[in-house]
From Swiss-Prot:
<dbReference type="GO" id="GO:0005737">
    <property type="term" value="C:cytoplasm"/>
</dbReference>
<dbReference type="InterPro" id="IPR046347">
    <property type="entry name" value="bZIP_sf"/>
</dbReference>
<feature type="compositionally biased region" description="Polar residues">
    <location>
        <begin position="128"/>
        <end position="139"/>
    </location>
</feature>
<keyword id="KW-0804">Transcription</keyword>
<feature type="compositionally biased region" description="Low complexity">
    <location>
        <begin position="178"/>
        <end position="192"/>
    </location>
</feature>
<dbReference type="InterPro" id="IPR004827">
    <property type="entry name" value="bZIP"/>
</dbReference>
<feature type="compositionally biased region" description="Polar residues">
    <location>
        <begin position="61"/>
        <end position="76"/>
    </location>
</feature>
<keyword id="KW-0805">Transcription regulation</keyword>
<feature type="compositionally biased region" description="Polar residues">
    <location>
        <begin position="1"/>
        <end position="32"/>
    </location>
</feature>
<comment type="function">
    <text>Transcription factor that promotes the production of melanin, a pigment that serves as antioxidant, reactive oxygen species (ROS) scavenger and that protect fungal pathogens from radiation and host immune responses.</text>
</comment>
<feature type="compositionally biased region" description="Polar residues">
    <location>
        <begin position="150"/>
        <end position="163"/>
    </location>
</feature>
<dbReference type="GO" id="GO:0005634">
    <property type="term" value="C:nucleus"/>
</dbReference>
<protein>
    <recommendedName>
        <fullName>BZIP domain-containing transcription factor BZP4</fullName>
    </recommendedName>
</protein>
<feature type="domain" description="bZIP">
    <location>
        <begin position="250"/>
        <end position="308"/>
    </location>
</feature>
<keyword id="KW-0963">Cytoplasm</keyword>
<feature type="region of interest" description="Leucine-zipper">
    <location>
        <begin position="279"/>
        <end position="307"/>
    </location>
</feature>
<dbReference type="GO" id="GO:0003677">
    <property type="term" value="F:DNA binding"/>
</dbReference>
Amino acid sequence: MESSWPAQSSFSYYNQGSMQTSSRHASSPTNEYSDRTPRRSAAQPQMPAFLPPPPPHGHQLTESGGDSLPSFSHSLYSPYHGPGGNLPSSNPHGMAHSMPSYSHISALSGTGSGFQYTNHSPMGLNEPLTSHSRSQITHSYHDPPRLPGYSSSPNLHQLSPVSPTAHLLPSMQPPSASPSSSSFPSSIPRTPATLPKGVKRHSLGSEQSFDSWDDEQEMSSGKVTGDRKHEKDSQPWGMPQEEYKKLNPKDKKQVRNRIGARRFRAKRKDYVNQLEAGIRLRDDEITNLQSQLESQRNEINELRLQLKLPLLPRGELSGLGLTMETQGQMERWENNDSMSR
C-alpha cells in the first residue's frame, strides 16, 4: 500500500499558496484513491483538522476525469446526507466500501474563481453503491420506528394473547387489522364464529326440546305425586299422558296451573286441620288443669276449717294463673293470725 502513493501530492488544502496557484490537472482516480487506510492522515501532519469553506453561491464545477458531480449551492458546511447522489462510475482498485478514509478531499478547481473546495461525498468513492450496501444504509437511517399499537409491529403478540376482536366475525373485525393479518403469529388461537354458533345451537335446542322439558316436568311431578294416594302415577295431570302431549302449549299451561291450584288447596286444608287438632289438644289440657286446681283448693279449705282458719276466697284467675286478693282480705288474714297466737 505504501508503494502506491502518488509521487506528487494531488490533495490541495485550504491555504494561501493553493489559492494563488494556477489551475492544476486533476490526478487520475487510480492515484487519487489508491490508499484508503487511516494511516493516510497519520502520514501527513500538515493536514488541517477542519474542512475548507464552500465556494461562493452559483459556483459551477468543471469536469474532472470525465466525471460529473452535482452543483454545490450550500452556504454552510453540508452535513452528512446518506447515499443517493450521483456518484462516479469507476472503482479502479475494488476497495471495500466500509473502510474509513480521509481521502475524500479532492483537488477540484472552479472556473470563475480560484477557490477550491472539498468533495463532500460521504464515502469518497468513484463507483456507485451496490444494492446490498445501499439497502443496508437506507434501512439503518430511514427505517421509520415501529409503534407497539400498530399491527405491523413485531411486539404485537406481547400485548394481550386473547384480543377482544379475536372472537368477532370476519365482517365485524376493524378494517385496520385486515391488511396486516399475515403479521399475526400463528400461535394465537382464533375462534371467530364459536359464540354465535353456540348461541344458535342453544336456541334451536331450546325450541326442539320443549316437549322433552314437558316430559321431564311430567316425570318429576309423577315422582312427587306418586307419594300421594289420591293420585295415580299413570295420570299425573288428571288425564293420560298421550292426551296431555297432544295439547298445545297454552292448554298444557292451563292444565298445569289447574293441577297446581288443586294441590295447593289440598295442602292448605291439611295444614289447617293440623292446627285445629293442636288447638283442641290445648283446650283439653287447660280444662284438666282447671279441674285439678279446683280440687286442690277445696282440700286446702277443709284443712283450714279444722284449724279454725278462714277459708280461701275464690279469687279471679289472671292470665298467668295467679290469684289476685284485695286489701281487705289481706287485713283479715293478718287479724286472724294475731288472734290465733
